[in-house]
């Protein structure tokens, strides 16, 4: 148990960090070693043996992968470090997204034999979007094919990052024994089996030239960030270690540089210097820009991290716990929150009671009396709070920026086996969809089937497994189906008029709207613009018109799939002093949309996946031939040590069952990763097939 009072360190000594990477790069093992060396646990956990503290779900232990982002707290050199270990599998990217939204810094773990891999790119882009400062850890330096310098080069080429090596490895592969610290110019080698003991000593003679060359490169990069250091560097004066660290810290926090370290977490080497780097170079809550918020009057304000300020926090994750019910994970940005107090949910405009406050250690709970600015805490008692909601004081309500999540690309139908299962299933799928914003639940109006939509086959497999294990629901699972989308090719203008006169107050709504195609690769998939002038439609009805279009777009006119890539422009309309209402304008907008679709040329879109296959040379020909038969667009063929890497774009509909085919084509020696890339117009044959089913 942690002493709860010890948790409350000064904000400057707090680090909220995420551990992120491609699947199998060693994130969870790195986190397990961090917990061991900081004294948070006393036995070395193993992902392969299912004993990792941070992988606590049964499915995680069985599969040796991280599915949910797990949170924990540890201490290092008088600093408190809150860590979230995130999944590396693309199907669980939502866990990375919401973790990065509330963290101040991150450790990006790379497999030193592979460098930057597909999901490394995805999580890096997510971190870029939230401007999260990062340090890089080149893991698995003890593996055959490990190459520290190749891995750094891949960061430049694939991530367009500016990595700066602050260590170089001593030895490689089976001969990896330690690192050279380029800032202090000392060698560090590990002397005990569990990695808890190490010695600092002079740099080996055979490494001096390389160390001096790499230090020169490091100082040169730092000198670009600081004039005073540049002068000392040009005058060839001795550079103080603290000065170097200070400049590197500023450059890291400003996202100008990425410090790079190395080690072998599974062999217990390199973790203590990594912890030093977390403390030395990643930001505390007071080092990052104040979070932006909107007041009820629409004014944009900034909320600085202060314990004395008004309470403000973001619920970034909901979890159903079998013992305590619903847990809301909250990042506290300002003020203090006490157990038993009330909190205002400004997103839903309701007041809720904080029954308990808990600091989480994976699935273990430690009760707390209060939480302060900078904390990541789990709250019990918030019955109506969902992911992305703002929590604040009712006296000074604010609204933080909402969270956005990717659309699901694959669906399955599920049916309960018995009447008892049916009753339990309704509650279970509701609880799971509340936890996971990328899991969508729809009921087919014609068949009554429940359709689950998610990010990939593994995602939906885990969901159905959880239905059975955690909720005791037995279901029959249908074959996976592609989640198609629809869009428009042409611009079209149409009128929508809704008039009802049936005794008493009537209904009147009238709009003229233009609908234009938006680029499918752009940030926005829907845009609404009001171009009316002179009050032809009162302002209070405009949101209802936008809502009417959005609702109409949920079921496309071609095959009933949701529509994307549409700009709706309100041009004109009219209203009635007595009969007009929000409902009437909502209906009028949906009528205008349906009328415009007759001239906008709606088309069907299919999801396209970015596929990477790593395979021995002798199987490349057969695999490329198979991909071509699957309508793949081969992007590149690269070499990686003694393997080939095939990169391609393939329609999702062509990838069902691909793992089995690939195993057969490569005698089990190939591995593949697929992640959603974009939507593109489906060919006629696919359209015909889809329309037959509808």
From Swiss-Prot:
PROSITE patterns: G_TR_1, G_TR_2. The gene is fusA. This is Elongation factor G. NCBIfam families: EF-G, PRK12740.1-3, PRK12740.1-5, small_GTP. InterPro entries: EF-G-like_DII, EFG_II, EFG_III, EFG_III/V, EFG_IV, EFG_V, EFG_V-like, G_TR_CS. Keywords: Cytoplasm, Elongation factor, GTP-binding, Nucleotide-binding, Protein biosynthesis. GO terms for biological process: ribosome disassembly. Its main location: cytoplasm. One of its GO terms (molecular function) is GTP binding. Catalyzes the GTP-dependent ribosomal translocation step during translation elongation. During this step, the ribosome changes from the pre-translocational (PRE) to the post-translocational (POST) state as the newly formed A-site-bound peptidyl-tRNA and P-site-bound deacylated tRNA move to the P and E sites, respectively. Catalyzes the coordinated movement of the two tRNA molecules, the mRNA and conformational changes in the ribosome. Residues 12-286 form the tr-type G domain. GO terms for cellular component: cytoplasm. It is found in: Cytoplasm. It holds the Pfam family EF-G_D2. GTP binds at residues 21-28, 85-89, 139-142. Belongs to the TRAFAC class translation factor GTPase superfamily. Classic translation factor GTPase family. EF-G/EF-2 subfamily.
């Amino acid at each position: 148990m942690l002493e709860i009072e010890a948790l409350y360190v000064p904000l400057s000594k707090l680090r909220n960090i995420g551990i992120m990477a491609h699947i199998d790069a060693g994130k969870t093992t790195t986190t397990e070693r961090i917990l061991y060396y900081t004294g948070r646990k006393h036995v070395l956990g193993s992902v392969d043996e299912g004993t990792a503290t941070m992988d606590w779900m049964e499915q995680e232990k069985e599969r040796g992968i991280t599915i949910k982002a797990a949170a924990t707290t540890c201490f290092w050199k008088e600093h408190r470090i809150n860590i979230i270990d995130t999944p590396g599998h693309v199907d669980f990217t939502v866990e990375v997204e919401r973790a990065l939204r509330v963290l101040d810094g991150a450790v990006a773990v790379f497999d030193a034999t592979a460098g930057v891999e597909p999901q490394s790119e995805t999580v890096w882009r997510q971190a870029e979007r939230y401007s999260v400062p990062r340090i890089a850890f080149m893991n698995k330096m003890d593996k055959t094919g490990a190459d520290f310098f190749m891995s750094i080069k891949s960061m430049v080429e694939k991530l367009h990052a500016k990595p700066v090596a602050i260590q170089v490895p001593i030895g490689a592969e089976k001969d990896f024994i330690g690192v050279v610290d380029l800032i202090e110019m000392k060698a560090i080698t590990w002397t005990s089996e569990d990695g808890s003991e190490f010695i600092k000593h002079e740099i080996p003679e055979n490494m001096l030239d390389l160390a001096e060359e790499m230090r020169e490169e490091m100082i040169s990069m730092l000198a670009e960030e600081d004039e005073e250091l540049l002068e000392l560097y040009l005058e060839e004066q001795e550079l103080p270690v603290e000065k170097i660290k200070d400049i590197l810290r500023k450059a890291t926090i400003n996202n100008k540089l990425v410090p790079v370290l190395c080690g072998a977490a599974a062999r217990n080497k390199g973790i203590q210097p990594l912890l030093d780097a977390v403390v030395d170079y990643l930001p505390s809550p007071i080092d990052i820009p104040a979070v932006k918020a909107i007041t009820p009057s629409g004014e944009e304000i900034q909320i600085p991290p202060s314990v004395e300020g008004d309470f403000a926090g973001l619920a970034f994750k909901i979890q159903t716990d079998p013992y305590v019910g619903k847990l809301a994970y909250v990042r506290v940005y300002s003020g203090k929150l006490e157990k038993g107090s009330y909190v205002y949910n400004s997103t839903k405009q309701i007041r809720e009671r904080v029954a308990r406050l808990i600091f989480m250690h994976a699935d273990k709970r430690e009760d707390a009396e209060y939480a302060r600015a900078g904390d990541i805490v789990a709250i019990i008692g918030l019955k109506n709070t969902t992911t992305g909601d703002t929590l604040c004081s009712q006296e000074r309500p604010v609204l933080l920026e909402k969270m956005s999540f990717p659309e699901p690309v694959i669906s399955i139908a599920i049916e309960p086996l018995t009447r008892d299962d049916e009753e339990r299933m309704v509650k279970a799928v509701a609880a799971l969809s509340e936890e996971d914003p990328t899991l969508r639940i729809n009921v087919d109006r014609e068949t009554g089937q429940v359709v689950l939509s998610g990010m990939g086959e593994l995602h939906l497999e885990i969901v159905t497994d959880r239905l059975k294990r955690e909720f005791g629901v037995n279901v029959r699972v249908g074959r996976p189906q592609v989640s198609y989308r629809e869009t428009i090719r042409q611009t079209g203008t149409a009128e929508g008029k809704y008039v009802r006169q049936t005794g008493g107050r009537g209904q009147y709504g009238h709009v003229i709207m233009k609908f234009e195609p938006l680029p499918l690769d752009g940030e926005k998939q829907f845009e609404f613009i009001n171009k009316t002038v002179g009050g032809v439609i009162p302002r209070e009805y405009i949101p209802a018109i936008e809502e009417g279009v959005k609702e109409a777009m949920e079921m496309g006119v071609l095959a009933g799939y949701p529509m994307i890539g549409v700009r709706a422009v309100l041009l004109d309309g009219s209203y009635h002093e007595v009969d007009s209402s929000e409902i009437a304008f909502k209906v009028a907008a949906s009528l205008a949309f349906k009328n415009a679709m007759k001239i906008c040329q709606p088309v069907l879109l299919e999801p396209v996946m970015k596929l990477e296959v790593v395979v021995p040379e002798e199987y490349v020909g057969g695999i490329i031939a198979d991909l071509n038969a699957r309508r793949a667009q081969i992007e590149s063929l690269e070499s990686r040590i003694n393997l080939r890497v095939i990169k391609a774009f393939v329609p999702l509909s062509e990838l069902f069952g691909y793992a089995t085919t690939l195993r057969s084509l490569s005698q089990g020696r190939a591995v593949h990763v697929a992640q959603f890339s974009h939507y593109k117009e489906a060919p006629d044959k696919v359209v015909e097939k889809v329309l037959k089913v509808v």
